[in-house]
Amino acid sequence: MNVAVQSRVDRETIGVARKTKAYVALTKPRVIELLLVTTAPVMILAQGGWPNPWLILGVLVGGTLSAGSANAFNCYIDRDIDRVMKRTQRRPLVTGELTDREALVFAWIIGVASIIWLGVISNWLAAALSLAAILFYVFVYTLWLKRRTPQNIVWGGAAGCMPVLIGWAAVTGDISWAPVILFMIVFLWTPPHYWPLSMKYRDDYASVNVPMLAVVRGRAAVGLQTILYSWATLACSLLLIPVAGMGLVYTLAALAGGGWFVYETHRLYDLAVRHEPIKPMRVFHASISYLSLLFLAVGIDPLLPF
């Protein structure tokens, strides 16, 4: 492993505002935003209309704490490789804005708080799913899969699918086929979302011996896999139509958004096999827009009379 030289801050000069900002950064808020995009629409679908606004707000708060805890544990565990990878050298455990102990205590506090909070404001099934998401992300993905297999993001990505189950369970108190399909949509979407990012930062991952698919197989193999998973995502999204009785808005969003996503993955692969310059982040950003559009339609469709 290469050793990067770090510029660590003097902890005695860190004020309250900067310390607070460091704690927020530890939770990876941009990742949390993407996770929460799926939660509220699923709650609307589960209710068949608007749930209690306070329930939506409460579940979003609980989901933020849960995901933040998992991400904070991840930062603590991966602090050794974060000090080497260029894209992670501004994280608070690398810069010294937070100590290892502060990060670990914080992760435990907000994790426990998320479980209790969700149990109290919704139900204990939602709380149990929150606990399962944290444990899976920390132990299965971060500690077991991430540094061992190129399929790390495939199976580890299951933790990022849990918000749809949590949102559904918070409203209905159970799990049916509709949330399972929604779970699978996010599960199948995750690899073609994340693998292009790993293509851009291939050298970063290689420098710390993390066997991302782009590191061990190359960009053509990544391009082909993104195609396969994007088609699977599109097909799975269409299954929701008969299962949940989705209407015209969702159907159009699934077809148009899914078709666009598939096109972008094909374009990435075509450029890769021709050894032409590629822009993997184009697929990365397209995947975010696609998922946001799809789940926006999930939330809008039950509110319409047609």
From Swiss-Prot:
One of its GO terms (biological process) is heme O biosynthetic process. The keyword Transmembrane helix applies. GO terms for cellular component: plasma membrane. The keyword Repeat does not apply. It catalyses: heme b + (2E,6E)-farnesyl diphosphate + H2O = Fe(II)-heme o + diphosphate. It is a multi-pass membrane protein. GO terms for molecular function: protoheme IX farnesyltransferase activity. Keywords: Cell membrane, Heme biosynthesis, Membrane, Transferase, Transmembrane, Transmembrane helix. It is found in: Cell membrane. Pathway: Porphyrin-containing compound metabolism; heme O biosynthesis; heme O from protoheme: step 1/1. Its EC number is 2.5.1.141. InterPro entries: Protohaem_IX_farnesylTrfase (IPR006369), UbiA_prenyltransferase (IPR000537), UbiA_prenylTrfase_CS (IPR030470), UbiA_sf (IPR044878). It is an enzyme of class 2 (transferase). The chain crosses the membrane at residues 31-50, 55-77, 104-124, 125-145, 168-188, 218-235, 238-258, 286-306. Converts heme B (protoheme IX) to heme O by substitution of the vinyl group on carbon 2 of heme B porphyrin ring with a hydroxyethyl farnesyl side group. Carbon 2 of the heme B porphyrin ring is defined according to the Fischer nomenclature. Belongs to the UbiA prenyltransferase family. Protoheme IX farnesyltransferase subfamily. This is Protoheme IX farnesyltransferase. The gene is ctaB.
